[in-house]
Structures are given as structure tokens and as C-alpha cells.
């Protein structure tokens, strides 16, 4: 497949075993066929009733070009679960936030803080220090549709210990 993202002006290329397609218009969703099966695409949050992992992951984020160690102690997650399946309780509408710390560019990520977030989570307390950080948000719960806003972190300058 080939996808052009008009907003970011970039192309995505991948593979998906489908032999014919019909766009939405006559039908509510795009449809495709493969191996004598017809698939509805872009419908729901799951893979035909089975949950799959959805995630977004950042590249390393430097603070002061990586010249300063910083300590992260709190995070406001800013995630919305508004379009999740209506039968799910608020406790089941959740995503996992993983913050990873890196001491040097070639050293790899050494520490991780993992926090489960649901629709009532306003603040996460954590302890993580490094020169740069990576963020991954993921969900593996069936029926969950999440949207990431702008997470905020409370960070302070820290020494090189």
C-alpha cells in the first residue's frame, strides 16, 4: 500500500495482502478482498473482534541539546478515550505511558518508568533522570480508542552522578 499524509506532506509505504478494493461511497467503509474473504476496513477499534497493539513512540528528546542531566518527577498524560466502545468501563479505557531515559546518545535507553493511564488520571508521579528521553504510549485493550494530546512533564536540572 501507499499512503500520502496531506497534513505532514509525507508518504508511507507498506504491504497488505489484498487483491481488490472498493472505496467507501456505495458502502459505509472501504472494502477489500483476499483468499475468498471480504474485509471492511477502517471500521471499529479492533481486528475483527480481537484486540491489537496500537502505539505511538517518539524519537529521543534532548533537553538543552543533551548537555544537561534532568530529573523528571511528574507527568500530566493528556490522553482522551472519547471514541472507545460504549460498553467499556472507565477503568478499562486505558493506555500505558512508558518514559525511557538515556545517559548518552550511544548508550541506549537504560531506565524506564511505566504508568497505566485511564480517563480519570490527571497526574503520574515518577522518578527518571537522563540526558534525553523517549516516550511510548500504547494500548492492547479490546474496544479502546485513544487520542494523544500534549503530555507535560515536570523536569528539573540534575547533576551528573
Specify the residue positions occupied by each region the protein language model found.
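Beta-sheet repeat architectures centered on beta-propellers
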Residues: 1-161
